[in-house]
Every structure is written in structure tokens, then in C-alpha cells.
From Swiss-Prot:
Heterohexamer of 3 UreA (alpha) and 3 UreB (beta) subunits. Keywords: Cytoplasm, Hydrolase, Metal-binding, Nickel. InterPro entries: Amidohydro-rel (IPR006680), Metal-dep_hydrolase_composite (IPR011059), Metal_Hydrolase (IPR032466), Urease_alpha_N_dom (IPR011612), Urease_alpha_subunit (IPR050112), Urease_AS (IPR017950), Urease_asu (IPR005848), Urease_asu_c (IPR017951). It catalyses: urea + 2 H2O + H(+) = hydrogencarbonate + 2 NH4(+). NCBIfam families: PRK13207.1, urease_alph. Gene3D superfamilies: Metal-dependent hydrolases, Urease, subunit C, domain 1. Residues 129-566 form the Urease domain. This is Urease subunit beta. It comes from Aliarcobacter butzleri (strain RM4018).
């Protein structure tokens, strides 16, 4: 029996070779492979196949806790269609689900039984939960904003709206680190806290790693001197944790070459590598071409629009405790906001030279816009630069995989947590996001945290069905009680991980970061460009390997007003 492609897609979602648009962008995804079996698809509902003795085995007991059926998976590993099995909060298997007594080709681990729940994803997209590595923990209100955007892991530093936290992503000292870990214990996300890395004292930094910091942050407002950089990286090497850096905008303790020299070819994660958010003016962006640097961007400059420059000056004055009445403060602010380097930042993302996107939450960046702005850049670059190498006029899979890697697998690798999160792969935590294709990147439908639904777009709770308006994000059972702790984790250093849970009396599991010191740009998935980046100190013109970068601001972006009328 044959049915039309249109009818098949309406019942089971698109299949191999079918194409679809991401939200209202010009990005077109093409399904590379379909792991389901035509005519044997698992589908739940009245008169459908997932019933006892049909696609549900009447005898199976040890089965997946949840199976997501017929999902379109968009991941750095590929764009494909499959069923996803989840057990004990982790991805158990990806492939074809069903009853092996009746159907050949059932993937091991995807047998459906009486102990299996079903989430129907026909025609919908599944991605890994986003990872934001640049969080200023200023306000707890950021948590729900991030979660409702599709972010499931938040990494950074801070202690609330203290002046230091407003400007820098550091949680300084054992007591502050302990209190922050305890404070997020009932929140349905993974967290990691970075200690203050600005010290010439090895011991002062060691104490923070032993207290539970997952890494260290160097920030110019605390003094990112070559000696502080060297000391911080020495501690990181000894304890296998990552160092993030916001370099010296004013070039007080040396120019960018002095900072790179202090790295001594050791691995480091550079924040807002373009420089509008901070860093050696005007040429910090050079570091994005180095083999030992893991470069990231923050979202306020992404993508470059006609309003970017004007918005940034006021933001910068507030975030860094500057005064418009002090000429030196105004000069400091103006030195960081450069249209040509901001324009070049988008191109560096498209080339894979900048590997990671993040927010810089409430400190010049927007915590709920990491994902949306990443895709806006991808759209803008397709409009300006055309088809990416390896793609064709009918699909943009290579570009799509490059950009999704920027907020999933690459931040995970940079922070040493890719064994646990960052992609849709067997064995990893089931931190997954379900999207309607028309709302992809803008408004997720369901956020699954550790295999359990934590947040969802939900209608009136007094209605007779789940869908009546008002539809809004509401916390689900995965966010309540002890479930939130059981389905999420705290990332810490190895040295702190063994006894931290009992020491602090927390319910979240504690996992150690790993393999942060033996990696480099070559490990950044689909974003591993290494080359010579030059910035003219007078004109701010940018060249890559001697070739000038050309890019303009855009006047309109997708994924914007039409999605936020209500």
C-alpha cells in the first residue's frame, strides 16, 4: 500500500529527503535519514499502533520510561528522524521503537511496554537543551527565562545583585560558592559556578576549586594582568578545570600580545571575543584564530543590526559602573563599541572561527535570547554570504549543524561536561527540547529535564482539555518537589565532587568536569577555524588570512515581532 508524501507527512512527519523551514528564517533543513520503518511506525492514540499486543509488547517489563516517537532530531551529529528512548533520566537508545515480537528492526532499548510513557513528536523537532556559559547570577528570575527559551544548563558566577556580580561572572570564595550551590538546589536546571580567578596567589584560587567551583573566571574589572592569568591557568592545569577570561580593554597591563603570551599556549575560554562586551581594544578578536583559544560571543551584538551601536553605549555604562560625567569613563565605553568589528563577528561565526554563543545575562546580554539570536545570525549570514560550503540551494544542513553546535556541544566541551550533556546521543542526560517547526528557536513547546517534563506551553488549567487559551509557559511536575533535584546536577571540580553533596546537604547530584586542559580549537565541533585575524587599529577593518571581511548591519530580523505580539 502506498500513500502520498503529503498524507504521510501529516500522519508521521516528514521523512528522508523532505525539507522544511526553521521558523520564519530562510534556513531550510533536509532530513538526512529516517530510522523508523515505513508501515511499522509507532504512533499513540485511539486506533493507532501503540497498543498492547501491537507496537506495545504484552510481555516486556524492563523497558524505557519514556519514548519520543517520530521526532526530527537537529543536532551537530545530524538532521534525522527517529524514536528516542529515555530511562533513568538518560538517553537509552535512538532508532526504531516498537514490539520486537511483531516487527523486525526494533532498536535495542526501544521496546515499548506497559511501563513506557509516550511523547508524540510527529512533525516536531527535538534538540539538546542549550548550555549558557556566561551567566551573571544577578537575579533568580533568570532561571525561568532561560528554561523557557530552551536552555537547560547555566554556567557562570555571581552572588545576586552585588556590584561585583553586576559586572563580573565570579562567585568568590568558599562561603559564597557553597551558598550559591545550595540556593539552586530546587531549580530544574544544571548549574556550574566559576570562582574568581584574578589573583597572584595560587592558594587563594585553590581554595575555590576545592569548595566546588567548576572553573575560574578572569575579569578585567578585578585586574586581568599577565601574572594573574598565569597563576590562574597554573591552578586550572593542576585541577583540570576551565578558565574563562574577559581581557584588559584599556590595555593597562599590556596589549593583546601580552595576554596571549601569558596563556603560554594553554587552553582558555575567551568571553565576548569581538570586544564590545570587553577585552583588549580594538583587537581582542585576534584570539579567535588561535589554536589554544575556545572563543565565544555574547548575544547583545548578535546579529549586527541598525540599532546595535546605539543600544550598547548605555548598556555598557550601567554594567561596568561607569559615569557619563567622567570623560575617561565615556572614552572607555566608546573604545569598546566598534561597528566594523561587530559586523565581522557575524562572519567569524559563519566561518566557524567563533565557536560558542552565550548570553552575558543582565550584564549587557539577554538570558532568554541565546538560541534565538544564534539562529538570527545564521539567517543574516545566509542572506549576506549565500550558501555555506557543502550546502546547496535547496538545503542548509551544514550551516544549521554549525550553528546548533554553538550553544549545545561546544560549550559542553569547553567546560568539560560533554560526557553528560550537549547533544542528542545515547548515554547523555535526557535534557531535550521539543519544538513546533514554525516556532523553532523562538518558543519551545516542551522542555524535558533529565527525562521528565519541567516546563511546557500549557493552556488554562481549568479547561476541559490542555489547549484552551491562555497558552503560556507553566512549570510542570519535573520542576516540583524533589523531582527537580533528582533530574538535574551541579557541575564541580573533581577534587570537590566526591563529598560535596553530603557536605552541603543538597539533593542535586554532583558531577565532575573532565578533560578541560587537553583540548583546543580543533575540538570545537564544526567550528574549528584557525587562522590569522587582523584588526586595523585606526580604521577597525578586519581581515582573515589577509582577506577583508565584508558585512553590513541588517534592518530586519526573523524570529522577532510576529512571534511576540502577545
Amino acid at each position: 500500500m502506498k500513500i502520498s508524501k503529503e498524507k504521510y507527512a501529516s500522519m508521521y512527519g516528514p521523512t528522508t529527503g523532505d525539507r522544511f523551514r526553521l521558523a520564519d528564517t530562510t534556513l531550510i533543513a533536509k532530513i538526512e535519514k529516517d530510522y523508523t520503518i515505513y508501515g511499522e511506525e509507532s504512533k499513540f492514540g485511539g486506533g493507532k499502533t501503540v497498543r498492547d499486543g501491537m507496537a506495545q509488547s504484552p510481555t516486556a517489563v524492563d523497558v524505557a520510561d519514556l519514548i519520543i516517537t517520530n521526532a526530527i532530531i537537529i543536532d551537530y551529529t545530524g538532521i534525522y528522524k527517529a524514536d528516542i528512548g529515555i530511562k533513568d533520566g538518560k538517553i537509552l537508545a535512538i532508532g526504531k521503537s516498537g514490539n520486537p515480537n511483531l516487527c523486525d528492526g526494533i532498536t535495542e532499548g526501544l521496546e515499548i511496554g506497559a511501563n513506557t510513557e509516550i511523547l508524540s513528536a510527529e512533525g516536531k523537532i527535538i534538540t539538546a537543551g542549550g548550555i549558557d556559559t556566561h551567566i551573571h547570577f544577578i537575579s533568580p528570575g533568570q532561571i525561568n527565562e532561560a528554561l523557557s527559551s530552551g536552555v537547560t544548563t547555566m554556567i557562570g558566577g555571581g552572588t545576586g545583585p552585588n556590584t561585583g556580580t553586576n559586572a563580573t561572572t565570579c562567585t568568590p570564595g568558599e562561603w559564597n560558592i557553597s551558598k550559591m550551590i545550595q540556593s539552586v538546589d530546587d531549580l530544574p536546571l544544571n548549574f556550574g559556578f566559576m570562582g574568581k580567578g584574578n589573583s597572584s596567589s595560587y592558594e587563594a584560587l585553590k581554595v575555590q576549586i576545592e569548595a566546588g567551583a567548576m572553573g575560574l573566571k578572569l575579569h578585567e574589572d578585578w585586574g586581568s594582568t599577565p601574572n594573574a592569568i598565569d597563576t590562574c591557568l597554573s591552578v586550572a592545569d593542576d585541577f583540570d578545570v576551565q578558565v574563562a577570561i574577559h581581557t584588559d580593554t584599556l590595555n593597562e597591563s599590556g596589549f593583546v600580545e601580552a595576554t596571549v603570551g601569558a596563556f603560554k599556549n594553554r587552553t582558555i575560554h575567551t568571553f565576548h571575543s569581538e570586544g564590545a562586551g570587553g577585552g583588549h581594544a580594538p583587537d581582542i578578536m585576534k584570539v579567535a584564530g588561535l589554536s589554544n583559544v575556545l572563543p565565544s560571543s555574547t548575544n547583545p551584538t548578535l546579529p549586527y543590526t541598525k540599532n546595535t551601536i546605539e543600544e550598547h553605549l548605555d548598556m555598557l555604562m550601567v554594567c561596568h559602573h561607569l559615569s557619563p560625567k567622567i570623560p575617561e569613563d565615556v572614552s572607555f565605553a566608546e573604545s569598546r563599541i566598534r561597528g566594523k568589528t561587530i559586523a565581522a563577528e557575524d562572519v567569524l561565526h559563519d566561518l566557524g572561527a567563533i565557536s560558542i554563543t552565550s548570553s552575558d545575562s543582565q550584564a549587557m546580554g539577554r538570558v532568554g535570547e541565546v538560541i534565538i539570536r544564534t539562529w538570527q545570525v545564521a539567517h543574516s549570514m545566509k542572506q549576506q554570504r549565500g550558501t555555506l560550503e557543502g550546502d546547496d540551494e535547496k538545503s542548509d544542513n551544514n550551516r544549521i549543524k554549525r550553528y546548533i553546535a554553538k550553544y549545545t556541544i561546544n560549550p559542553a566541551i569547553a567546560c568539560g561536561i560533554d560526557e553528560y550533556v550537549g547533544s542528542v546521543e545515547v548515554g547523555k542526560m535526557a535534557d531535550l527540547v521539543l519544538w513546533n517547526r514554525a516556532f523553532f528557536g523562538v518558543k519551545p513547546e516542551i522542555i524535558i529535564k533529565g527525562g521528565f517534563i519541567a516546563l511546557a506551553m500549557m493552556g488554562d488549567s481549568n479547561a476541559s482539555i490542555p489547549t484552551p487559551e491562555p497558552n503560556m509557559y507553566r512549570l510542570m511536575f519535573g520542576s516540583l518537589g524533589r523531582a527537580s533535584g533528582a533530574t538535574s546536577v551541579i557541575f564541580t571540580s573533581k577534587v570537590a565532587s566526591s563529598n560535596l553533596k553530603d557536605k552541603l546537604g543538597i539533593s542535586k547530584n554532583v558531577l565532575p568536569v573532565k578533560n578541560t586542559r587537553n583540548i583546543g580549537k580543533a575540538n570545537m565541533k564544526l567550528n574549528d577555524f584557525i587562522g590569522d585575524i587582523e584588526i586595523d587599529s585606526e580604521t577597525y577593518d578586519v581581515k582573515i588570512n589577509g582577506e577583508p571581511i565584508e558585512s553590513n548591519y541588517v534592518e530586519k530580523v526573523p524570529m522577532a515581532r510576529r512571534y511576540f505580539m502577545f
